[in-house]
Each structure stands twice: as structure tokens, then as C-alpha cells.
């Protein structure tokens, strides 16, 4: 696969400690992808801070998935895809609504991306949900 670090960068939505959430500006496939990122290996650590942040990582993923199912695109998504990557010493969960695949992507690998203003609106709405975690 031809993934680059740019596929995991985007509009910063929320950060708490070492856990961060963004909306991709260069999605891999869909036009809307949420990245939830944490230091790699924290779930296996005995350190109290690592354990607390591992829990927060899981909670942030749940909030992102609920947002995709209930609010993004008017709550029309009935399912989602969730992928995990290790990149640059971090574990990144990439969450995206599951839609019928775009023929532009299948035939030409052209990803459809939302307008920046739409991404900013989604970022604000998702941030409000994530703020309830702390």
C-alpha cells in the first residue's frame, strides 16, 4: 500500500496528554476519515499514566465511531471501518464511515475530499463530544 504520513495528518480536533484526534485532509480512501493517535505500546505498560491514556485512547475511538454513525453526514452511515497503524512510534486508529466504494477510487485512486469548511464544521462538532471525556 502506498500510505504516507500525510494520510494521518489533518485538522486538529482534540488533544489530551499524548492522545490526539484529527480529521484527515488527505484521506486514504473516503472523503472523511478520523485519526485517533496514541504512543505505541501504552496498553501493555504497567505505568499508571500509560494505562490512563490507553483508556482515553479507547474512549476517543468510541466517541469518533459514535460521531460517524450518529452525526456525520446526517447520521446516515449504518456501519464503519476501523483500521490500526503503527507509524512514527504511535498507534493510529483510522475510523471512517462505510459506504459503497467510489468508482473514482476503484478506477483511478482519486479520493474525494470534503470541502475544508465542511471538515472544519465536523471538527468543531466532534471536538464538543471529545471534550466530555475530561
Where do the PLM segments sit?
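HIT superfamily nucleotide-processing domains
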Residues: 1-134
